[in-house]
């Protein structure tokens, strides 16, 4: 990071490390997937193809992140369990939850056509994620039992509901019929009215799906699969690097929290621990802890900052222009515009390179200010939009692998401190862009990267400007403002003519579309010209 007088704003960042010996679970849920399923005409009560898509995405997550050793999912949710010794991203909660949600969203978009070849993806899917911290393997067992119980109850209810709706009843009539019904009553309703034996329904619907890694190289068993080799990364030319390693296994079990199921798989109790006994009733206090959500301080400005994950490699593989690829920056800006259009509580965004900072209004109650939901929703929506709009900005360049972004949320108590944060990011933009412009011009002139770094070591702004001017004929201040200033995204105000009774026309300001600007946001003039952005008087 660049050193500046604004660096103090980093002191407002809060550590969110999940401490040992707690086990880490990342649970993701589809954001407003009831609407998503309606728009894309999923079958009710269960769409087998959409569930297989979710399972395929979860499998990709296990391949991408070796520290994730177990996953359980049903409907539009999945829970990913990290091995007990994991130090993934220093166990920082916001980073982990946002990264998993982002990658899952990217893979969901990537695989959509594979599972729905004749259905257009109408809009960007997104996911909310959270960290569940389990103090022991017994708590993990209770969590898994809780999720599978919820799978069973939800599926049984939904099966009854949709069979009644298909028989001609209205949704409200159906809900009234099912109100306060118990498990046995719902089973009888299905059998007596529709001839359905609930226990004979596909296990995929009733039991959910679990994935875990096994050392077996190849085998064939009902409901599980794995390959002989996998792509673990891509080299500098974008070619897949394949390597034999533990396989991810997909199974359906009546009791994923059962001692017999868990302990028969040596990889599970090695990575996570033994289940000493079967679980009976789930402790209510455990459930309360699973549902706990940390909230951001009220009446503070919240900044959700997202950063591309390993974007140095991503830019090399996709042959972005150096030091700046204008199309890549415009793609980022387009995604930021989409975020502001999707989330009305976001008032402003500032971006440079592979990062963007989104400012929520200080009075925002988005997701009841639940930190994890806000971060993951923004990051995953940004990611899936990036995937869907790639072809608009790179029509002749294939996306070789899905990108991912991590995020964090920081509270700033006053507007002055918020503006200092934004100034810090723009100062950083200038310093990094000036350095990178010099660096890549030196490399293109024949110097090695190490030689270019040594040449620039200890140089100041004036010296870099002279280098560009004297050696390469480049006036730094004449470079495109999108490179030098970064991008500001906000809702524009336009003048609308209003005819008064006396016949005079006065101007009335109305909010219009979201736009992109390349201004100096350190200067107070910008904020004075656009007081509506942060509701300044």
UniProtKB/Swiss-Prot annotation:
GO CC field: nucleoplasm
GO function terms (MF aspect): GTP binding; magnesium ion binding; tRNA guanylyltransferase activity
Cofactor(s) named in the record: Mg(2+)
Domain of life: Eukaryota
Keyword annotations: GTP-binding, Magnesium, Metal-binding, Nucleotide-binding, Nucleotidyltransferase, Nucleus, Transferase, tRNA processing
Subcellular location: Nucleus, Nucleoplasm
Record: residues binding GTP: 307-312, 353-354
Cofactor comment text: Binds 2 magnesium ions per subunit.
Predominant cellular place of this UniProt entry's protein: nucleus
Residue positions binding Mg(2+) 2: 307, 354
Signal peptide start-end: none
Keyword Cytoplasm: no
Reactions listed under catalytic activity: a 5'-end ribonucleotide-tRNA(His) + GTP + ATP + H2O = a 5'-end phospho-guanosine-ribonucleotide-tRNA(His) + AMP + 2 diphosphate + H(+)
Assigned EC number: 2.7.7.79
One GO BP: tRNA modification
Residues binding Mg(2+) 1, per UniProt: 307-308, 354
Free-text function comment from the UniProt entry: Adds a GMP to the 5'-end of tRNA(His) after transcription and RNase P cleavage.
Family listed: Belongs to the tRNA(His) guanylyltransferase family.
Full protein name: tRNA(His) guanylyltransferase 2
Classification lineage: Eukaryota, Viridiplantae, Streptophyta, Embryophyta, Tracheophyta
